[in-house]
Each structure stands twice: as structure tokens, then as C-alpha cells.
Amino acid sequence: MKLIREEIENVEVIVEERGGKKNLYIEGVFLQGDIKNRNGRMYPCGTLAKEVSRYNEAFITKGRALGELGHPDGPTVNLDRVSHKITSLRQEGSDFIGRAKILSTPMGNIAKSLLGEGVKLGVSSRGVGSVAMNNDCLLYTSPSPRDTAI
């Protein structure tokens, strides 16, 4: 088993206002299946769909789908670095579209400031799994343990 990370850079910034309070969200492709990514890996769409379903049930629906600012070295979320909470993750073809609320934490405030200044932030997913060589790419072969983060 090894740490597996994937980064996607095209996300949209959305500002929603409710009751005079503004909330900042990012939305876009969080995961992609059945294509070779720039890290030379391919994740079968069926495996991603199963893991996303499990992640939705275990984390998103319970308000526990937290993420960090930056690229952590391990598969678990460090609460002192939390910047966002994933509010939805759904499949559209071989893409998995996510939406995350930027939180009012120290790291969330840094993310808000960067986005406000026009910095383009991306989404990085990580987990622990196994990979095997398949033609010209590494094929993800086994699911992550329970504490995978997006």
C-alpha cells in the first residue's frame, strides 16, 4: 500500500449569500475515472463510484468530509489545517463533481484570501491503495482504507 494523490486544477468559485451571510464554495471535477492522469495513474470508474458512494455515506452525509489547504504527506486529515468541508460529490459520466464550502478556520481564511486575490486553487485527493503497471500507466487496484480524504 502506498499514498496515492491526484490533483485537478479546474474548479469554479461560487459565492452564495443567505440571510446577509456570504459563503464561499469551490465546485468542479474532484476525481476522474478511466483516464490516465498526469501522475501516470488510471482509476477504474467502477472502483471510484464504489468509493465515492462509501465516502458520501460515511463522511459527507454526516458533515465529516473535511479537507486541508496544501498537500499533506499522509492519508488522514490534520484538524489544525482544515480549510473546507465537502458538501456534495456526485458522478457525471467518468467525472465526479464535488462542491466544498470554504470554512472560517485559519487555513480556510487563507484560502478565501487567495481566491479573493484571483489565485487559482485546485483540488487534490489522496488515499492509500495499491497500484499495478498496466501498459503505459499505473492502474489503481485496491480501495483505500476508511480515512481517505478529498
What are these regions (language model features)?
Residues 148-150:
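N-terminal low-complexity segments that are often proline-rich with Ser/Thr-Pro
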Residues 30-34, 71-73, 102:
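Short glycine-rich, polar/acidic loop-and-turn segments at beta strand-coil junctions
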Residues 30, 42, 65, 75-76, ...:
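Short, solvent-exposed loop/turn motifs
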Residues 42, 70-73, 143:
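Selective for proline/serine-rich intrinsically disordered segments
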Residues 60-75, 123:
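Short conserved beta-strand and strand-loop elements enriched in small hydrophobics
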Residues 12-28, 66-68, 85-142, 146:
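Residue microenvironments linked to proteolytic maturation
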Residues 72-84:
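A surface-exposed loop-and-adjacent beta-strand signature within N-terminal beta-sandwich domains
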Residues 1-56:
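Polar/acidic, low-complexity leader/linker segments enriched in S/T/G and N/D
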